[in-house]
Amino acid sequence: MKLLNSIHLYPPQHTCGAEYMAHWINKDIKANGGDVRVLLHQANHYRINSMYTYDGIDVFPPEEMVIERLLTWSDAIITHLDYTDWSIGIAQVFKRPLFHLIHNTSTYQRIVWAEDPQYIIYNSEWAKAQLNYDHPSIVVTPPCDWRHYDTNVDPSYNEAITLINLDENKGGHILRQIAEALPHRKFIGVTGSYSEPADKGQHTNQPPNVTVLPKTPTIKDVYAKTRILIMPSKYESWGRTATEAMCSGIPVISSGTPGLRENCGKAGLYFDREEVKLWVDQIEKLFNPKAYEKASKAAKIRSRELDPMASLERLRNFMRQSITDHKRKA
């Protein structure tokens, strides 16, 4: 299998959940005998003007001759988000099967209207139920390998309550309210690679007890200092950082969107994001050793239940069979 990613941005510069989902799928395909390359459409966003290799994956800026060579080289294309429309068009021109990584529940009309071969990879059962595109599909939750993300640090010795991405949707303004209500506690706020809504930006103006850190490709360093992860998100189709944190036994307090509930299951602690006092009270409860031990154990168990190896194997088989079927019909 020779898989071409047709996407806008990629790690290590762009550190969002969608890009890391793509990257872990790419790594798995390559580790199991396939080959993967990334066409980086918005390379100029980070002033990238030459090919680079990240974690074994080759990434190419969109030079005209390079684009044609990559498309000719490929057996199939995978895309998501910003370059869905472009990829549908170019896949038809080059007669390649196209796989769509679905990270949210917004309907993409071009996917609805697109002629076969289109294949859908939903990031949650909830997203599949909401969208139900009329194309062959599979559900693969964002791969978070606990063997990689477990910091092997006992989080009960940590002090920080952490929020990753300080935009409006993720609750950067709510972090401020919680931190102001708990001046005796320490907080970490990590800025994100994007802001939703964009015009509101990142809420970096935080109280003195909040350490604001820049976005980082080494998020484990943050988890190694984290006692509790908070996710007061308005919208979250899955919430990858919750899974990552649970790998180290870090309890997650979240707003309980359908995606977060599917992700965290019984290990999650859920509150309306506008009820700040409930968040404050729950944080204080988790400084009780017995309460923390129970929540931490549940988080770690849940992360092991989400072991991605079986679902990644199912995805490889789904993609290989889809490519084989396409070649047979061609």
Task: Annotate the PLM regions.
Residues 234:
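Aromatic "clamp/platform" in nucleotide-sugar-dependent glycosyltransferases that forms part
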Residues 146-206, 212:
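Conserved catalytic-core segment of nucleotide-activated headgroup transferases in glycan assembly
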Residues 71, 215-216, 221-226:
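Short alpha-helical donor nucleotide-sugar binding micro-motif in glycosyltransferases
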Residues 290-320:
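A charged, aromatic-enriched C-terminal amphipathic alpha-helix characteristic of glycosyltransferases
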Residues 251-254:
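Short hydrophobic beta-strand element within catalytic cores of glycosyltransferases
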Residues 268-276, 284-290:
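Conserved acidic donor-binding segment of nucleotide-sugar-dependent glycosyltransferases
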Residues 118-150, 157:
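Donor nucleotide-sugar binding/catalytic pocket of nucleotide-sugar-dependent glycosyltransferases
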Residues 222, 257-270:
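Short acidic/histidine- and often glycine-rich active-site loop of Leloir-type glycosyltransferases
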